[in-house]
């Protein structure tokens, strides 16, 4: 019995892993990362070089990447060449430097787009906000990560002072601090990058899972390369490139897996409270969302995404998709703050139009019917909808008690 939740979660995770085409997306991100590697290093070196007292942070960050992230021999070869290219790139003109920065920003924009797809978000941040967030991550991200590495190294060295009396303290610190630091880095990505509210606890769970799988992947890749040195025997030094590409691909697969865990946790934990499937369930949810927006319109306020979800008990991705459909219909729109409002007066929105959009497309019914009988049925259904029709304002008035909303 205790295995059922784990089995259900893994099944749901596998379905979303396949639906989001993670293997193909990881390959695309690996290639994009390879192109943006030198620009990223150039910006990072520029940040560490221009800020006073940052040399130690840069050296600590480089050592951490080599020891905990990059594959051993291939990572050192690639890092050596990339640093040489970055030092040469630092002598570029203003236009060349700008192009490098644009290339690095394009990678971050691609990561944001992929994360939004995983969370089912179709509405991206405004362009200026995206550029600001990406530039912040590009410039201050290495500094924060370098500072974290230095702090981690200090904790490890401090724990080593106790290793003479308690040897296990140093071993535990050396074994746990790198995964925790990686987990914090991944958790920050899952929490900050998607244009969607993410609970910190879910981001931490996804980040720690990704960090553990990442370290296991790194160890496994190292053992594979050491046990099957075919690439090294055939290609020599050039073997670093395919090994590095493989490492990039596996790394992005793990990062995307952690993002999927973070995005899947809310739907899995709330599965008992989700709306049960029934014929017309999407139309019912659309009407309930529009009724909530109509009630809020009378009060002159928007409605948040979480409140609309609670009203309908929809899963996050289903609620996001339904709201996007309402936006595409021109009925609702998202504010700059991320909340939702009606685009016109509630008295001008008829429920018959909503039902025909989300449950019963009578125009398609009539057009696809091969005989006159099908068209007669469509016309009778249309007449029935019109006879029982009411506006959103009338529905909101019924929900909030008589006379609470003015009916137009």
From Swiss-Prot:
InterPro entries: UPF0761_bac, Virul_fac_BrkB, WH-like_DNA-bd_sf. GO terms for cellular component: plasma membrane. It comes from the Bacteria. It is a multi-pass membrane protein. Pfam families: Virul_fac_BrkB (PF03631). The keyword Transit peptide does not apply. The chain crosses the membrane at residues 29-49, 92-112, 131-151, 172-192, 197-217, 220-240, 241-261. It is found in: Cell inner membrane. Keywords: Cell inner membrane, Cell membrane, Membrane, Transmembrane, Transmembrane helix. The keyword Metal-binding does not apply. Belongs to the UPF0761 family. PANTHER family: INNER MEMBRANE PROTEIN YHJD, UPF0761 MEMBRANE PROTEIN YIHY. This is UPF0761 membrane protein azo3165.
């Amino acid at each position: 019995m205790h295995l059922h939740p784990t089995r259900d979660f893994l099944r749901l995770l596998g379905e979303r892993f396949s639906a989001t085409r993670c293997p193909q997306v990881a390959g695309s991100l690996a290639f994009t990362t390879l192109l943006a590697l030198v620009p990223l290093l150039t910006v990072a070196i520029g940040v560490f070089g221009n800020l006073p007292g940052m040399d130690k942070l840069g050296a600590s960050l480089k050592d951490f990447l080599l020891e905990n992230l990059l594959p051993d021999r291939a990572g050192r070869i690639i890092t050596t060449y990339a640093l040489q290219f970055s030092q040469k790139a630092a002598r570029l003109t203003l236009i060349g430097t700008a192009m490098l920065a644009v290339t690095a920003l394009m990678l971050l924009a691609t990561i944001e787009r992929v994360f939004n797809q995983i969370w089912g978000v179709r509405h991206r941040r405004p362009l200026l906000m995206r550029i600001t967030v990406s530039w912040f991550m590009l410039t201050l991200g290495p500094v924060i990560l370098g500072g974290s590495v230095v702090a981690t190294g200090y904790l490890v060295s401090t724990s080593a002072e106790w290793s003479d009396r308690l040897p296990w303290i140093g071993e535990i610190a050396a074994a746990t601090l790198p995964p925790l630091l990686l987990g914090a880095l991944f958790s920050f990505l899952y929490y900050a990058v998607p244009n969607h509210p993410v609970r910190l606890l879910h981001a931490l769970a996804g980040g720690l899972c990704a960090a553990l799988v990442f370290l296991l992947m790194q160890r496994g890749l190292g053992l594979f390369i050491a046990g099957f040195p075919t690439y090294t025997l055939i290609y020599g030094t050039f073997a670093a490139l395919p090994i590095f590409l493989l490492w990039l691909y596996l790394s992005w697969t793990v990062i995307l897996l952690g993002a999927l865990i973070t995005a899947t946790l809310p739907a899995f934990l709330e599965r008992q409270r989700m709306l049960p499937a029934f014929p017309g369930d999407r139309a019912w949810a659309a009407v309930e969302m529009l009724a909530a927006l109509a009630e809020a319109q009378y009060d002159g306020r928007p409605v948040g995404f979480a409140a609309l979800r609670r009203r309908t008990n929809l899963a996050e991705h289903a609620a996001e998709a339904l709201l996007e459909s309402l936006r595409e219909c021109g009925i609702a729109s998202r504010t700059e703050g991320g909340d939702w409002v009606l685009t016109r007066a509630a008295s001008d929105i008829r429920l018959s139009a909503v039902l025909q959009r989300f449950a019963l497309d009578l125009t398609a019914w009539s057009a696809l019917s091969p005989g006159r009988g099908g068209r007669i049925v469509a016309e009778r259904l249309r007449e029935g909808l019109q006879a029982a029709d009411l506006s959103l304002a009338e529905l909101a008035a019924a929900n909030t008690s008589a006379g609470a909303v003015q009916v137009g």
